[in-house]
C-alpha cells in the first residue's frame, strides 16, 4: 500500500519546553503536518487515554492521522487511525486481528531482519533507523547509516520512513537511499516554532520529490 503522508511527527512532551503538548501539536498541524504518533511511553493507560482522546479530537479537526504507540487498546478506545508497534510489541498480525482491516499499523525497525519480519507479519509501513545520530534514539544503539537503509529498501516493498537525526540538511541523502518519507521527533516537537518547522520540512520534501519526478529515467 501507499501512505498519504511523508512527514510523520512523533510526540515527546519532554521536548516541548514546558508548553502543553496540545499547543505544540496544533502548531505542527497549522504548519501542514498530517500524521502523528502519540508516543508517551512513561504514561500508564489511565493517563495516556485522556491525552490520546485530546490528540484524536485535535487531529480530526485538521483531517490528520493519529497513531498510538504500542497500545492497541488505547488506539481503539479513542478511535485512532492506527497503532505504531515496536519489535517487542504484539506482532502486527495479532494487532490486525484486534484492530480490523481499516486501521494503519506501523512498525519501528532497526535491522534488515526486523524489517522483513514486520513486513511478513502484515505491517502497513516501517519506520527505520536511527539513520543518523540523535539523542532520542541513542538507547537503540549506533546509527544504522544510509547503506542499511538502502539494503532494507531493496529487500522490502512496504513504505519506509527514515528516523534518527533526519533534518532539512540531509533529506536529499535519505530520499536518495530509498526512504518514502521521514519520521521526526525533536525536529518538530522540540523546535522553537513547530509550525514553521513543519512547513519547512514539508516544503523541502515536496521540492525534492518534484525535482526527482522531473529527472529523465535512466
Please name every model-derived segment.
Residues 1-90, 97-124, 141-143, 147, ...:
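Conserved N-terminal beta1-alpha1 strand-loop-helix module at the mouth
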Residues 136-138:
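Glycine/threonine-rich flexible loop motifs
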Residues 177, 181-184:
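C-terminal binding/interaction regions
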Residues 13, 132-134:
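A short, flexible beta-alpha/helix-coil linker loop
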Residues 37-41, 134, 183:
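A short, mixed-charge helix-start or loop-turn motif at secondary-structure junctions
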Residues 133, 166-167:
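Short acidic/polar capping segments at secondary-structure boundaries
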Amino acid at each position: 500500500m501507499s501512505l498519504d503522508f511523508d512527514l510523520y511527527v512523533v510526540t515527546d512532551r519532554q521536548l516541548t519546553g514546558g508548553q502543553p503538548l496540545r499547543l505544540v501539536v496544533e502548531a505542527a498541524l497549522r504548519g501542514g503536518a498530517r500524521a502523528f504518533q502519540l508516543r508517551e511511553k512513561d504514561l500508564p493507560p489511565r493517563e495516556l487515554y485522556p491525552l490520546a482522546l485530546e490528540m484524536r479530537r485535535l487531529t480530526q479537526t485538521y483531517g490528520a492521522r493519529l497513531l498510538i504507540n504500542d497500545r492497541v487498546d488505547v488506539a481503539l478506545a479513542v478511535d485512532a487511525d492506527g497503532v505504531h508497534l515496536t519489535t517487542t510489541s504484539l506482532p502486527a498480525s495479532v494487532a490486525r486481528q484486534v484492530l480490523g482491516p481499516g486501521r494503519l499499523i506501523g512498525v519501528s525497525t532497526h535491522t534488515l531482519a526486523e524489517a522483513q519480519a514486520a513486513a511478513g507479519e502484515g505491517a502497513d509501513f516501517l519506520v527505520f533507523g536511527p539513520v543518523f545520530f540523535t539523542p532520542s534514539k541513542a538507547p537503540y544503539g549506533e546509527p544504522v547509516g544510509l547503506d542499511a537503509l538502502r539494503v532494507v529498501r531493496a529487500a522490502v516493498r512496504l513504505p519506509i520512513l527514515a528516523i534518527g537525526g533526519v533534518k532539512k540538511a540531509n533529506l536529499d541523502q535519505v530520499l536518495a537511499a530509498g526512504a518514502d518519507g521521514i519520521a521526526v521527533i525533536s525536529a518538530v516537537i522540540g523546535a522553537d516554532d513547530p509550525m514553521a518547522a513543519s512547513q519547512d520540512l514539508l516544503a523541502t520534501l515536496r521540492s525534492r520529490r518534484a525535482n526527482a519526478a522531473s529527472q529523465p529515467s535512466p
